[in-house]
Amino acid sequence: KQYGLAHFLEHMAFNATEHFPHGVMTYLRDHSLVFNAQTGINETRFQVNNVPVADSEATASMMLLLKDWCNGIKILPKDVEKEANIISEEWRQSRNVNKRLTEAIAPYIYNHSDYATHNVIGSEKQIHSYTAKDIKTFYQQWYRPELQCVAIIGDIEPTEYEKEVKRIFGAIPASKKPITRENALVPENDTPLYYRFIDKENTSNSVGIYQRNLAITDPTKRDVVGDQLKARLFQRLASQELAMLRNDAKEEFITATVSYSPLVRQYDQNAWDFVPYAGKEQAALKQILAIRERIYRQGFDSEEFEQAKEALYNEMKPLMES
């Protein structure tokens, strides 16, 4: 198992690299750049914001930094030891009720698939057992051009930047013996899965109804944008259904939310979360299920649908014009 190695490598990426031998953090902070990185179940993302596009030196440095993250991270033993202590403290701080809840419901969210036991940060024992060689091997195995993507967003000349991306990143050699990346499958369940979480530190009583859906395979740009717009429209319209109950003072819950978003690679998730009034757990559940079923069978009112589209367009229009 390589649990925790992707997250460990994310930490290493902010230490020494080929073009930033004194550390990436020093450069980013000295130039007041906003940066972030996150490792999830399927991928690691690095992000730098507020890069002044009029400053050619800054943009050139960021291109080299992105290239270094792809292929030029220096994995030094002294940095491994330092980051192991930092990650270990991160692990200890994460051992709270929210973490216990996440781990408890994972077998039901992912139906006992490999995702159910996947531990992004790893165990404390694993964190301190990994060596520079282990991390370097992981880096060489999985940080390959065909598994990477570079996105540059801003007021730029696309043709020039595309040329630079091809020049800089095209120099990264392909792996001679690439390991196949296998996508874990989440099996269908014949009946709904149920889990009740009880914890002495859990002070709120909440309920979640989650439904997995297969995502589009090899989506086009149009597919991705279309799905995002549909998800936002669905969330807006479904939320209005919940709001109507509150306006009529007929709701059996304190608060309720609905969302449609990516779950893991190849799967999306429709989630209904609500906090019922004390003693109204079953009534609230029946009420949410009734709304969910009505939407599934009848859809939305055509007038409300057009109003939602117009409202979403008006929200997005300033962004498109800026």
Q: What are the residue ranges of the model-derived segments?
A:
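Histidine-acidic residue clusters that define the catalytic metal-binding segment
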Residues: N49, S56, P107-Q148, P158, ...
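Solvent-exposed coil/turn segments that connect beta secondary-structure elements
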Residues: T17-E18, V51-V53, R92, I153-E157, ...
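M16/MPP (pitrilysin/insulinase) zinc-metallopeptidase core fold and M16-derived inactive scaffolds
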Residues: K1-P52, N96-L101, T117-S123, L233-D268
